[in-house]
Amino acid sequence: MLPAAMKGLGLALLAVLLCSAPAHGLWCQDCTLTTNSSHCTPKQCQPSDTVCASVRITDPSSSRKDHSVNKMCASSCDFVKRHFFSDYLMGFINSGILKVDVDCCEKDLCNGAAGAGHSPWALAGGLLLSLGPALLWAGP
C-alpha cells in the first residue's frame, strides 16, 4: 500500500493532467460538391461550430439520379438550412429542379459515410457469418 503522501501526490498529478489536457473541438467530414462521400476528409471544426452537417442536392428529374454531397462543420443546423435554402436556390427547389436534404448531428465524424447496408439480405448475411463458427463447432 502506498503512503498517504504518495496517494495524495498521485491524485494531484492525475487532476493536473486531466484539467490541463487541451480541449478538442468537434470533428466533421468536410467536402464540397462531390458525388462520392469517400472524397470527404476529417476536419477539426472551429470552437463556435456545434454540429456536423450533410447536404445532399439531387436532380429528381434525372434518370441517373445525379447528386452532389456537401459535408461541413456549422454553428447550427438552422444556419446550414438558411444557406442552402436561400432565395436563389428556392426557385429551383420549388420548381422541382432540385431536391435538397439537410441532416445535422453533434458527435465527432457523425456526418461520415452511411453504415453498411440496411437491406434484409445484409442483415441475414451478417447473422449467418456470426453464427457460422458456432454451427460448425456444434457439429452433427
Swiss-Prot record:
Keywords: Cell membrane, Disulfide bond, Glycoprotein, GPI-anchor, Lipoprotein, Membrane, Signal. One of its GO terms (biological process) is nervous system development. SMART domains: LU (SM00134). SUPFAM superfamilies: Snake toxin-like. It is a lipid-anchor; GPI-anchor. Believed to act as a modulator of nicotinic acetylcholine receptors (nAChRs) activity. In vitro inhibits alpha-3:beta-4-containing nAChRs maximum response. May play a role in the intracellular trafficking of alpha-7-containing nAChRs and may inhibit their expression at the cell surface. Seems to inhibit alpha-7/CHRNA7 signaling in hippocampal neurons. Glycans are attached at residue 36. A lipid is attached at residue 115 (GPI-anchor amidated glycine). This is Lymphocyte antigen 6H. Residues 26-91 form the UPAR/Ly6 domain. Interacts with CHRNA4 and CHRNA7. Residues 1-25 form the signal peptide.
